[in-house]
Every structure is written in C-alpha cells, then in structure tokens.
Amino acid sequence: MPDQISVSEFVAETHEDYKAPTASSFTTRTAQCRNTVAAIEEALDVDRMVLYKMKKSVKAINSSGLAHVENEEQYTQALEKFGGNCVCRDDPDLGSAFLKFSVFTKELTALFKNLIQNMNNIISFPLDSLLKGDLKGVKGDLKKPFDKAWKDYETKITKIEKEKKEHAKLHGMIRTEISGAEIAEEMEKERRFFQLQMCEYLLKVNEIKIKKGVDLLQNLIKYFHAQCNFFQDGLKAVESLKPSIETLSTDLHTIKQAQDEERRQLIQLRDILKSALQVEQKEDSQIRQSTAYSLHQPQGNKEHGTERNGSLYKKSDGIRKVWQKRKCSVKNGFLTISHGTANRPPAKLNLLTCQVKTNPEEKKCFDLISHDRTYHFQAEDEQECQIWMSVLQNSKEEALNNAFKGDDNTGENNIVQELTKEIISEVQRMTGNDVCCDCGAPDPTWLSTNLGILTCIECSGIHRELGVHYSRMQSLTLDVLGTSELLLAKNIGNAGFNEIMECCLPAEDSVKPNPGSDMNARKDYITAKYIERRYARKKHADNAAKLHSLCEAVKTRDIFGLLQAYADGVDLTEKIPLANGHEPDETALHLAVRSVDRTSLHIVDFLVQNSGNLDKQTGKGSTALHYCCLTDNAECLKLLLRGKASIEIANESGETPLDIAKRLKHEHCEELLTQALSGRFNSHVHVEYEWRLLHEDLDESDDDMDEKLQPSPNRREDRPISFYQLGSNQLQSNAVSLARDAANLAKEKQRAFMPSILQNETYGALLSGSPPPAQPAAPSTTSAPPLPPRNVGKVQTASSANTLWKTNSVSVDGGSRQRSSSDPPAVHPPLPPLRVTSTNPLTPTPPPPVAKTPSVMEALSQPSKPAPPGISQIRPPPLPPQPPSRLPQKKPAPGADKSTPLTNKGQPRGPVDLSATEALGPLSNAMVLQPPAPMPRKSQATKLKPKRVKALYNCVADNPDELTFSEGDVIIVDGEEDQEWWIGHIDGDPGRKGAFPVSFVHFIAD
C-alpha cells in the first residue's frame, strides 16, 4: 500500500513550510498527499453505493408500509360494518365484540402509520440529501480542483529543474538533483495553491464523514425512540383490550354450546325425516332401475329418432355475429358441424358433454352448450327446430344409456361383466360382508377398493370425507367396476379387516356405532379407526421390525400380514431390508412386482392403492413401472397405471418404461403405456387373476345332495389351478354359459397357490437383461405336473364339463383302455377320470398345466385360443407324464377301510383325437350310462401284499401331513385318501410318511 499522510501530519508540514519555506521538507510529502486523496476517493465511492441501496430499501419499506396501512383500514371498516350488522340482527354480544376488534385494529393501524412516516422523515430524507448533495456525481468529481493544483505544481517544478540543469551545463557542470531549498522561493505560489486545494478537499471529506457517520447514527437513535413509542403504545392498547377478551372467551363458549345444542336437535330431526323417507326412496330407486336413465333436462320426442342429417344456421363468434349456413349431422352420440371451406375437417362434438337449451326469445332457435363454448343454431321454422332438439336429446340419452349398460352383444366384454357379477356376488357372501364394516347395518353396497371392505351408504359418506388417501369408495350397484377394483375385496373382507383394525376395541363401553347412530358418532368412530388407527392391533413398535414384517408379508404373499404392517403404521414406500434384491434400495412395491404371479396380484394392488408415492426409484433409478416392462408384467402395469404412476421417469440408463417395452418387444406393455400417454387408459380395467370362485350348481341330484351332507373323513383343501381366460367363447354360443363354466373350475376352501406349482421364471430370465434360454433348465429330465386337487367336493354336469375340457385340453396319443397295476406309465398326461353317480355328474378338474416358457407371466396373460377341429394335430410344449389313477377295478386299495362304500371309478377319458371313439363313447352318452354297482370295501385287516410305487419327480410337501420325496424313491402304499391322493411311507424309512399325489408315481411290477 503506498505511503499516505494523515490530516494532522498535513497540517504540521504545511505550517512549517509556511514559516520557513527554505528549510521545509514539504516538497517530499506531495506524493503522499496525492496517495491519500486517491484512497479517500475509493472509500467514498464504496460508501456512496451502500448508502444508495439503503435509501432504496427505506423507500420500499415506506411504500409497502403505506399499502399495509391502507389494507388495515379496509379491514377495520369491514369489521366495523360486520359488527354493526350483528347488532342490527339482535345479536348484540357478537356485534359488540366485532366492534371492539375494529377499534383495536384501528389504533394499531394509526400507530403503525405514524411509525412509517417517522422512518421516512428521520432516515429517508437525510440519506436523500446526502446522496444528492455532497456525494452527488461519479467517482473523482470531488478531487478535480486538487488534481488541477497538483498538475500545475508538477509542471512548474519540472520546468525549473530543466532550466537549472541547462544553466549548469553551459558552465561545464552536470547537476542530477535540485534541492527543495533552491527552488522554494520560485515555487512558493504553486506550493501554496496546492496546499490550499488539499486543505479544501480534506474539509469536504470531513463534512461527509460527519453526515454519513455521526448524523446518520443520530437519526437511527431517533427512529429507535419512535419504535419504542410504537411498541409501548401498542402494548397499552393490548392491555386495555385484555379484560374484554377474557370476558368474550367465556361468552363465546356459552354461545357455542347453545348453537351446538341447536345443531344437535336439527340433526336428530333430519335423521328422523330421512328414516321416514327411506321406504319412498327405495321404491323410487327400484322404479328408476327398472326404467332407462332419465336425463336431467327435457326429454326429446322419441318419434324423431336419434340420427339426422341436414342444414342449420350457426351464429358466428366474430364481431359481426352473422348467421352462417352449415351442414350438420347427428349420429352415435356426436354432432358433426361442417365448415364453410371443404379443406377444413368438420367439428365433432360429443353430446355427452353438451346440453341442449331452448331460446325463449326466438322460437326457431336453440343453444348447444359444450364444455368450452356455446353454439347458437337456427332452423328453418319452429317445427324443424323442435325436431333437431329432439334428435340431439335422444342421441345423447342413447349414448348415455349405452355407456351405463354396455354392449350386451359383444362376447368378450359380456364374459368380463359376468365374471365381475360373479366376483361381486361372492364378495357379498364372504364372512362379515353381510353387514357394514363400521356400523353393522345390513346389506352394505359400498366398497372401499383400497381396503377391501363393504360399508353402508351413511358410513361411505364419512369415508369420502376422509379422502382417497384413506379410503376410495365405489358403489357395487351404481358404479361400473372393473375386476381390478375387486382384488382386495375378494381377499380381505369385513371380518378379516376388523379382526386387525378393531382388535383393541373396548368391549365394556363400545364406541362402535350402530345402524341408528347419527353422523357425528359415525364420523368420530371412523376417524379414530382409519386415520388414528386407535383400535388396531399393534405388533411392532420400532421401525426395523415393521419393515421386516412388511418384507415378510410381501414375500409370503400374506395379505393379512400386509394389513397388519399397514395397521402398525409402516411407511409402505420405505426401502426394505432385502439381501437378495435385484437392485439396491428396493421398496415393498418393487419386491411385490418382482415376485408376482396370478395368485398374488392383490398384494401389488394393496401396495399400489395405499402407498403415497408410486414413483420411488431403486439405486439404479428403476421404478415399479420399469420392473413391469422388464418382465412383461402387464397385469401389474395395469394396476400401476390405474394408480397414476408416472411413465416419464427414466432410470440410470436414461430409459423410460416405454423405451424398455419397445426394446424388449413387450407389445402388451407398450400398448398399455401408449394408451396412458394419450389419455385413453381405462381405470376400470380387467386383470387376469386366479379368482377361485365358489359356484353353486343349480341342477343337483338327490345323490349329490346326500353326498355333500355326508361327513368326509380327513377332508383336505383343494389345490386347483383355475385361470379365467378370455377368447374361448367361440366353442359355445352362449358367452354367459362360458363364464359360468369358468367359475365352475374353483371349489370350496381352495388351497393357497404354491410357488412349486407355477414358478415365476420371468424375473430370473429377464431382469439380467440377457436373452432367456429356449427351455428352462431342470434338475430332472422332466418337470413335475401340477398337483391334483385333494378331496374335490363340487360336481358339474357332463355337458358343461365336456365343453370346458375341450376348451382347455391338449392333444394326447395312445389308447384309453383300463390298465392294470403292472402296466407301464403313460407317455402323455391322460384326461381326468370320471366320477360316475346316478346322474353322471363329472368331477370338475383343473385344466392342464400351462407349459412353462422363459416368460411365464407373459404366457399366462395371453387369452386362451379356441380349439380348432384338428386339435389332435396341435402339439403343445412337452409336458411331463401324468398317469391316471392306478386303482384296479377288482382290487380295493390298501387301507381302504372307510365308513362309507367306495364309489366306483369310471373309465378314464380318452384323448381328444376324434378317432378314439371307444374312449369318447361313454362320455358322449354320459346321461345314458348307468354306473356299476359299487363294490363293498374290505377292512384294513384283509391281508394284502403291500403295494409299492416309484417316484417319477421330486415333490416337496406343502402341509405337515404330506410326504416329501425325490425322484426314484420307492413308496409303500398304506392307504387311499381319495382318488388322487394316497397315504404311504418311504421304503426302509417308516418315519417318513404322509399323503402323496398319485400322478407323481408309477407302480412297480411285482
């Protein structure tokens, strides 16, 4: 930093120079004077900028403060007017309170206005005068006189030094320096002028320092006192109002109690009136249901029909408002309006979003109000106008009725509707679903799709108030539901839900409402049950245990375990502790999508509907939608799109779900995503799912009923694989019958679907990104067939069973003769054996297993194709042998000591090959075939040689009473549980015993 001179040093040096110019050393300090002026100028420039910003801020505060004062005054006026209105309406207590607050606000406003004015006067004005006065101008203006004096001084001293050096040179001398004393007298005038300008500059700087320092702080002190006065006066106003406020609080409590009592009386009166009108409302609803939908506007004359072509005059939207003749046509619920020029496409209006109104001023004019504008039309005469209006209204009514009732002539859509009705009927028959989940009212018809429970109409209104993030309500009778909205209802139900969510409900003083409770009681209870979860059973306290239970519930596909985790308050979108995750940081939704199959789709649905965020990404940026597209999982994709999952998110590779679907050529996923992008995705979507419906046969013989009433020893659950498939309605004319036959495939108390039956190979093959192999590797030569149902209970007519079998069968070779126990196993899976009764009902059996491919879910999502006439020529992928039951007709099975006689088995059905007339003969004449007399069962004490069988496949037990064995194990048959399941133990290891499927073994020839 250059040397500078202080003010005191400058004064001392100047005085010394003034007294003794020849002895002074001031000439050596002139450079320091100039450095000092430059430094002061830099500091002043910085201060000038800061003070300018300060002034700007103060002005902004003043402007906003005045605007605030103006708004406060308007608020005060409104309070004063409102209080006056209350006083005039015989409510003096409330009116006086409003007036007091008006006066209080007015006082505070006046104090604040005074404070703003003080700030403007005390701070803003001095700053403005300083910046426009002493600090006015740009950098360097203040030191211009000093710079001129310095320049003159330097010029004169340079000139004198030059003359002195030339004079010495003339006399033969050389001078390098000239002392100050030599030129002191000659430079006195210039030196005095330089000292004067320096002194003037320092005086101005001193004045500026006072104004921007001491004076500004003095002003801030004044403003501080003004602020103190503002707060003190405001506190006085508050203290003066405090007693009135305390009295007012007591009065308001009394007034509110009176108003609450009045409200309670009104609610009771309303409930009484509602109950009195319930009968009339039911009658009205029945009448409305029996007739077509009635539009909430005048009906058109039905004689004019729903279609019309012609010309109308349309008033233009321009400034001139001229009538323009346009060609118009009404068809299929749309009004088409042609333009004046042929090259422009006509405007097409959906009448479902329009309303037709008459024009009271012009009899031959009418208006059509759409969602974005109003069209003014004029006909040739009044009669023509009435015809056009009738056609428009009729076409709209027809389109609306078609939308409500659907197209009954489309086979596939009709099948889905029939399936939906069957599912709804079974949901209503579930335990606890005959009454409301919350109040116990009978026959609830409102479904919470995200919780799977049924409520009455009163409780459903409270559910709607909670919001869709707690409960999504749909009507079973009024709304058109898709099967995807019934997944949770089919798997949870009121009884299972309340077992968890009402586990801690106090029994002695029950707060649960009854059907006659008012809406307040219902709201308090429902809020406590669903939002606070006050009565739910809480199993886990810490978050780690909650996440572990959530992970286990998803892994084991336990919907009630998932509901328990939900009741514990776990965050369903949090990352789960999964050691073998496909990608790091997976959520429960990622895991559910990754391990889903036809039986666990409801697990995904619960997570989709009750998670706050469907767009959580893994460590590699994948969302659940990415997983769906990687695995071609269209069913989960439907659920996620219905839940509004984002389709624009890209993973770490920059791929969106649609990009993945296109790259892997997953056409179904690509189509769904394209529909969602264009806004054409239907949220009421149908999903492929193993519904396991219970179907009650209408035509049952007396023998069937007797058989159902007999106690069945060692009854086991069934394990059917019954997929409801579309596209097979060509095999029979009645599509409804096909849907009913599909529902027949399921039995009572069905066994849970086991992963060993149908493994989800999709993720193992595709998540790695490598192409799947042509055939999945297996440890044995062939894969095991699906396990047969255990102890089938429901029966089916021969005709429907025959039709159903033809729909889902695969061609087989070989004859259909009855084999003895020593025959070798069949090469191809046989047809299910017939169970013959007095009326020849057929035991329903599951369809043949779907052949495993590298993408099982993709194969299952495809609808089944109708069997062509030459079905025997179509070969499915190789399936493992599934030999028929080895029970010889003339030998009882070992251990067949039963309390009832053994029903004789009919001959097994032959292949579907039309040439096998012997096999199809008994089936085609099923209604004529008489069953043989049943043979009496022999007691277990009968000495028979033990029957030995050999395992064809590996089998892992699903239940404790079942046998686990490996391929090649020899099993000793101890008894027969039913036609498809026997009892036995491993040869040489009697401790390993249990039930085993007959189709997994073959006899060893003795």
From Swiss-Prot:
Membrane topology: Peripheral membrane protein
One Pfam assignment: SH3_9
Ranges annotated as biased composition (Polar residues): 288-300, 794-823
Domain of life where this protein originates: Eukaryota
Region spans: Disordered: 288-312, 701-720, 764-916
One Gene Ontology CC term in the entry: Golgi cisterna membrane
Domain Arf-GAP: 421-543
Gene3D superfamilies attached to this UniProt entry: 1.25.40.950, Ankyrin repeat-containing domain, Arf GTPase activating protein, Arfaptin homology (AH) domain/BAR domain, Pleckstrin-homology domain (PH domain)/Phosphotyrosine-binding domain (PTB), SH3 Domains
Induction entry: Up-regulated during monocytic maturation.
PANTHER family: ARF-GAP WITH SH3 DOMAIN, ANK REPEAT AND PH DOMAIN-CONTAINING PROTEIN 2 (PTHR45854:SF4), ASAP FAMILY MEMBER (PTHR45854)
Protein name as it appears in the record: Arf-GAP with SH3 domain, ANK repeat and PH domain-containing protein 2
